[in-house]
Amino acid sequence: MKNEIAAVVFFFTRLVRKHDKLKKEAVERFAEKLTQILQEKYKNHWYPEKPSKGQAYRCIRVNKFQRVDPDVLKACENSCILYSDLGLPKELTLWVDPCEVCCRYGEKNNAFIVASFENEDENKDEISKKVSRALDKVTSDYHSGSSSSDEDTSKEVDVKPSSVAATPSPVYQISELIFPPLPMWHPLPRKKPGMYRGSGHQTHYPPPVPFAYPNPGRKNKPFRPIPVTWVPPPGMHCDRNHWINPHMLAPH
């Protein structure tokens, strides 16, 4: 694990020195803090027998969705330097796996091997040479780390909100635009058995209440049906609360 972390640290220090914004002491301090942070993070997530396991956890990534890598930012804070002074590309991905470290500039470019190891006996000079050769080759191919759509180095890391607030548009429901409001329904009271029914005579029921639409100017008031007075047919008279048809009583 120490060789792979050393390759990552050499990779970052090479990019920082190329940006030429920090002094040598600040770069060395950043490299020391980054080494400590990565060792602490990877010690329980390192699987030489299965290098792909935990790959996402060990990945160092910067893109338009994550403009600052948390581990690199923590190393900057611990070494008292600004993240923007590193001069990192806006789109950068590093996969730190057992025996191999790979990198990709830009989200649409191909990945390349930063350094690969067959054993743990390699010294720092050999690791530094591997990283330098890989960087020299890739910078000529990818134009010094330019991304697929952005500039090659990040100028700012603070995400600033837009100064123009969007004016909220009125919200309408489809039901309000298509269907008019329905009238409130008042059910008729339940009648006792036998009401409106005579003994041995024709059964009469109360007339239906005509349906009407409510006044559109009174949307919030309950709708009350218009009362209708029932007029009996000609020839019928009431006898003790019963309507009697004299034709039915006539002998046949």
Swiss-Prot record:
Question: Cellular component terms, GO, for this chain's entry?
Answer: cytoplasm
Q: In which tissues is it expressed?
A: Ubiquitous.
Q: PROSITE patterns of this UniProt entry?
A: BTG_1 (PS00960), BTG_2 (PS01203)
Stretches the record annotates as Disordered: 138-163
* GO BP, one annotated term: negative regulation of mitotic cell cycle
Q: Which residues form a coiled coil?
A: none
Q: Which domain of life is it from?
A: Eukaryota
- Role played: Overexpression impairs serum-induced cell cycle progression from the G0/G1 to S phase.
- UniProt cross-references to PANTHER family, sorted A to Z: B-CELL TRANSLOCATION GENE, PROTEIN BTG3
Q: Which family does it belong to?
A: Belongs to the BTG family.
Q: What is this protein called?
A: Protein BTG3
Q: Which organism is it from?
A: Mus musculus
Q: Which gene encodes it?
A: Btg3
